[in-house]
Amino acid sequence: MENPHEKVQVGILARIVGNVERLNQSVATLNQELERINTRNRNLELMGQMCEHYGRATAFNLKTTGNRQGPV
């Protein structure tokens, strides 16, 4: 005996599989973009740390040598 709902179920399953494949592709693309953003953020964080350390070293050297002046 043939299931009368089989064709409908097969169609629904095919749509689900197609949607899941598209979703997986979208998630993979999102992950790639997030990785690029994270790389850029790491680079910006490193630059910020370098600037902060440079500022501290400059302030220390100016204070140590006695060449530090007040703000203009």
Swiss-Prot record:
Keyword Cell wall biogenesis/degradation attributed: no
Keywords attached to this entry: Cell cycle, Cell division, Centromere, Chromosome, Chromosome partition, Coiled coil, Cytoplasm, Cytoskeleton, Kinetochore, Microtubule, Mitosis, Nucleus
Top-rank taxon, per record: Eukaryota
InterPro entries the record matches: DASH_Dad4 (IPR013959)
Cellular component terms per the entry's GO annotation: cytoplasm; DASH complex; microtubule; mitotic spindle
Cell cycle recorded as keyword: yes
Location of the protein in the cell: Nucleus; Cytoplasm, Cytoskeleton, Spindle; Chromosome, Centromere, Kinetochore
Gene Ontology terms describing biological process: attachment of spindle microtubules to kinetochore; cell division; mitotic sister chromatid biorientation; protein transport along microtubule to mitotic spindle pole body
Coiled coil, from the record: 13-50
Pfam family, one: DASH_Dad4
Entry's family note: Belongs to the DASH complex DAD4 family.
Assembly information from the UniProt record: Component of the DASH complex consisting of ASK1, DAD1, DAD2, DAD3, DAD4, DAM1, DUO1, HSK3, SPC19 and SPC34, with a stoichiometry of one copy of each subunit per complex. Multiple DASH complexes oligomerize to form a ring that encircles spindle microtubules and organizes the rod-like NDC80 complexes of the outer kinetochore. DASH complex oligomerization strengthens microtubule attachments. On cytoplasmic microtubules, DASH complexes appear to form patches instead of rings.
Function: Component of the DASH complex that connects microtubules with kinetochores and couples microtubule depolymerisation to chromosome movement; it is involved in retrieving kinetochores to the spindle poles before their re-orientation on the spindle in early mitosis and allows microtubule depolymerization to pull chromosomes apart and resist detachment during anaphase.
Entry protein name: DASH complex subunit DAD4
Species annotation: Eremothecium gossypii (strain ATCC 10895 / CBS 109.51 / FGSC 9923 / NRRL Y-1056)
Gene designation: DAD4
